[in-house]
Amino acid sequence: MTTTKRPIALLILDGWGYRENTHMNAVYHANTPVLDRLNAQYAHGLISGSGLDVGLPDGQMGNSEVGHINLGSGRIVYQELTRISKAIADHEFEQNPALCDAVDAAVKTGGAVHIMGLLSPGGVHSHEEHIEAMCRMAVARGATKVYLHAFLDGRDTPPRSAKSSLSHFDDLFTTLGHGRIASIIGRYFAMDRDNRWDRVSQAYDLITQGKSKFQYDNAVTALEAAYSRDENDEFVSSSAITDANGQVATLQDGDALIFMNFRADRARQITRSFINPEFDGFARAVTPKVNFVTLTEYAADIKAPIAYPSDNLVNTLGEVLQNRGRTQLRISETEKYAHVTFFFNGGKEEPFNGEDRILINSPKVATYDLQPEMSSTELTDKLVAAIESTKYDVIICNYPNGDMVGHTGNFDAAVKACEAVDACIGRVVEALAKVGGECIITADHGNAEQMTDETTGQAHTAHTSELVPFVFVGRDATIDKGGKLSDVAPTILHLMGESIPAEMTGKPLIHVKE
């Protein structure tokens, strides 16, 4: 006999923050009658998704990976950015066994040390201070051929802001006496996560063969040429940088290749192209045998030395639900599927017992401002069907629109994205009401509420440190102030009448009135 469930749904509106300033605030200017009604009718508040509250440095904007780890684990999780920066400050980084072994092996055979990653102060996928520490460490250990393959940001940073980073690293290599920037390319190509292998192949060919659309003798010159082609940092075409003799750097057998991104989701595809013998995403002209090291763990099936393996998180929400015989569903589009599964489960790839997953393909468009509704209608169709099936105790759903369209910097499109999500929420709430379910609406971090940089006047494409909404569509209740993302999992267990495990240090925010 099938037991009928009265589900609790957690709707994560990605990139949807609250900002007092209404100028170029897509969340404010969007027509959102559903959320307006829910805020008027139900208990609601604001919670924190950034800085120390999510295990990041004070003031650091939140991001989707960090947000979902905190949401799912029910505790503040010390993030890789903080962890690695601390290791550098404590001089532990320069003794890291995985990094030292790769550098030493290359030095011993006269090989090169190639360092690749997002050259950015953004702190979301990487930090340029970590890349600098790696360059310094390689030279200190005797490497004379150090090649930096710089992926440019413009998404978690202003759209045209890479010049200062490139200039700094040119100066750094001059000071060190060895090394140089060997290539630049936008993250749009090197860090795709949606199986657009034609993009990744351009980064692969650039790093392995020095094969590129453009060639320059200086990285800043290459960047300025890209700007003259109207390419912002994120979209800079593959550009090889030649040495004094006009030669490009290539990846050879025995070289070290160290990937300095600490966030997994946009690091996986290009990593697999380098290390997977059965890789078939695109035809590889060369497959050099290199000592490949990842800064953190990108996926269980990526077999490479890891400089900083993940902490093992036990008793996350998913695991607690499994252990108590509860059923759960995770559902999102491609762009945020890893977040409601891998990251929400504390870095575990395999589903828990009783955990179903539904993946909706994100639309195949160059940038999501071209289709701001993304696949939200199809996602909601599946979500409503799952609610009405009464199979699940807990449903975790992410709507990517606010974040993915917010990143384009297109204000009008971001407004449309918010309006599309609002309409979907209306359908979800209606379906939950039919089966006696309840729902929490929140976000992982801000983005769409600030679409222009008030200082520079450029489009603001990055996340924010704003508070995010927290709405309880259910029984009459009060909501505590001062909450944070790590309070959400304990809140869900509390609403279910379940005890909260000791590992969850977050506190229930919702108190139902008797």
Curated annotation (Swiss-Prot):
Pfam families: iPGM_N, Metalloenzyme. Keywords: Glycolysis, Isomerase, Manganese, Metal-binding. Binds 2 manganese ions per subunit. Its EC number is 5.4.2.12. The keyword Thylakoid does not apply. Its cofactor is Mn(2+). It is an enzyme of class 5 (isomerase). GO terms for cellular component: cytosol. It catalyses: (2R)-2-phosphoglycerate = (2R)-3-phosphoglycerate. Catalyzes the interconversion of 2-phosphoglycerate and 3-phosphoglycerate. Monomer. Belongs to the BPG-independent phosphoglycerate mutase family. This is 2,3-bisphosphoglycerate-independent phosphoglycerate mutase. It comes from Shewanella oneidensis (strain ATCC 700550 / JCM 31522 / CIP 106686 / LMG 19005 / NCIMB 14063 / MR-1). The lineage of its organism: Bacteria, Pseudomonadati, Pseudomonadota, Gammaproteobacteria, Alteromonadales.
